[in-house]
Amino acid sequence: MANYEFSQVSGDRPGCRLSRKAQIGLGVGLLVLIALVVGIVVILLRPRSLLVWTGEPTTKHFSDIFLGRCLIYTQILRPEMRDQNCQEILSTFKGAFVSKNPCNITREDYAPLVKLVTQTIPCNKTLFWSKSKHLAHQYTWIQGKMFTLEDTLLGYIADDLRWCGDPSTSDMNYVSCPHWSENCPNNPITVFWKVISQKFAEDACGVVQVMLNGSLREPFYKNSTFGSVEVFSLDPNKVHKLQAWVMHDIEGASSNACSSSSLNELKMIVQKRNMIFACVDNYRPARFLQCVKNPEHPSCRLNT
């Protein structure tokens, strides 16, 4: 038998060892991969810039003001609505425009809000206005039984506030919001007022009133909210008469009255929709409010 010599074998199995050059290359590749992943994470987590607009931003402390007005209205002014959930109303309101491009808001975005907040206005108690907001609000406040849109819950809450969102954040935009002149008609404020104005008109019944500014060249302005939305949203099956109160500034010129071409245009629209139209120049109860600041004016004399 042949004699064989066996050499001692190490306990470790022989393996394929990378060259130093390959190890360096692998390390560099791993570092590049880590850097790439970190870079992507940083980009994704970095706050994106807000869209820049020329209009005023969301009103400061918006949510606090919203909730405060809601509570005042439901708990003090109209306690019959005390069961309304103000937090839910705020959340639903924000859901219409937060995290969205403020120029792409639709009527459907506010549909959940309109469905959530229901309010019944008594027949014969609806007062629309156009270019006469201050006097109309004075009148309903003193009269106590009539409602402008801003005397309803949603109108009261949103009156004179500004708001918008941005696609890059779940918060409201407190830096800037679109101005109506920026070719942005579908902004959250404009769409909101159109939606609730339409609902306000659709719900009206009996005899309705509109207060117009007779000191303007066109007391009835077709492009106003009343002229483009509300008058066409009245339901002739529920509203049988519209009365226009054409109010002139006491110190201004009374260049337009119920016989003007502007009011005749409104009359034609109303009558074509099978409703009765009536017009009063300087409706006396509202005139008295104007006379509070100008008691000596000739038009404020009792025999005038």
Curated annotation (Swiss-Prot):
It is found in: Membrane. GO terms for molecular function: hydrolase activity, acting on glycosyl bonds; identical protein binding; NAD+ nucleosidase activity, cyclic ADP-ribose generating; phosphorus-oxygen lyase activity; transferase activity. It is a single-pass type II membrane protein. It comes from the Eukaryota. SUPFAM superfamilies: N-(deoxy)ribosyltransferase-like. Belongs to the ADP-ribosyl cyclase family. Synthesizes the second messengers cyclic ADP-ribose (cADPR) and nicotinate-adenine dinucleotide phosphate (NAADP), the former a second messenger for glucose-induced insulin secretion, the latter a Ca(2+) mobilizer. Also has cADPR hydrolase activity. This is ADP-ribosyl cyclase/cyclic ADP-ribose hydrolase 1. It comes from Mus musculus (Mouse).
